């Protein structure tokens, strides 16, 4: 004749309790989980004038750095808002040893972007790559001080890009079209290709006009 066994108790460690990551206290010395930056991403349509809120971070992603820079120079009302790793590399060339240029350029660009977003200045950043890891650092920097985050995908120069860049471009386009960039903390996304690139005449950072 079998006898019933008492129910077994299961113990959870402090790090396993709670259904949400924010509910789970960290063990002493355990690394904190990155902040959740996810949001709703709205897909914009091309227009001759694009207006973003002052203090925004606008990322420009393109397989061609030259096309990216030409676009920024043509459409930005405030060209001083534009930063890129290429510009910093050029400033450092000949001033620091060649083997230190990349590290110093990343450091200086991070300092410049961080200072501007913290002070509420608008920042337009020409991305050096098309992968999500390239965007994450800057988006988190802006999210930490509650600045709006936007991206423009400029597909000009795709034919001249190498295979890796085209693959990364295809993945970014897919995520944009699917509305998945909100998972990265990006709030609006605009895709420009072919004739739509020329449709954009000006990008400004101004508050919305008051209703009369």
What residue ranges belong to the model's regions?
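Charged, amphipathic alpha-helical linker segments immediately N-terminal to NTP-binding catalytic cores
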Residues: 1-35
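Short hydrophobic/aromatic beta-strand immediately N-terminal to the Walker A/P-loop
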Residues: 57-61, 124
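Conserved phosphate-donor/acceptor-positioning beta-strand/loop module used by diverse small-molecule
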Residues: 145-164
């Amino acid at each position: 004749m079998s006898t019933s066994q008492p129910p077994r108790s299961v113990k959870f460690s402090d790090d396993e309790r709670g259904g949400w990551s924010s509910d789970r206290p960290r063990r002493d010395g355990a690394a904190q989980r990155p902040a959740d930056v996810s949001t709703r991403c709205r897909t914009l349509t091309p227009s001759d004038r694009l207006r973003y809120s002052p203090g925004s971070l606008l990322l420009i992603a393109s397989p061609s750095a030259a096309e990216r820079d030409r676009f920024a120079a043509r459409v930005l009302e405030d060209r001083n808002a534009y930063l890129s790793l290429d510009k910093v590399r050029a400033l450092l060339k000949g001033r620091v040893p060649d083997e230190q240029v990349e590290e110093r350029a990343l450091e200086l660009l991070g300092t410049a972007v961080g200072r501007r977003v913290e002070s509420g200045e608008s920042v337009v950043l020409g991305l050096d790559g098309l992968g999500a890891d390239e965007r994450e650092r800057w988006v988190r920097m802006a999210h930490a001080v509650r600045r709006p985050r936007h991206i423009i995908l400029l597909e000009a120069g795709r034919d001249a890009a190498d295979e890796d860049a085209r693959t990364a471009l295809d993945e970014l386009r897919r995520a944009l079209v699917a509305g998945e960039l909100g998972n990265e903390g990006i709030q609006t996304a605009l895709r420009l290709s072919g004739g739509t690139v020329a449709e954009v005449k000006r990008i400004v950072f101004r508050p919305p006009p008051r209703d009369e």
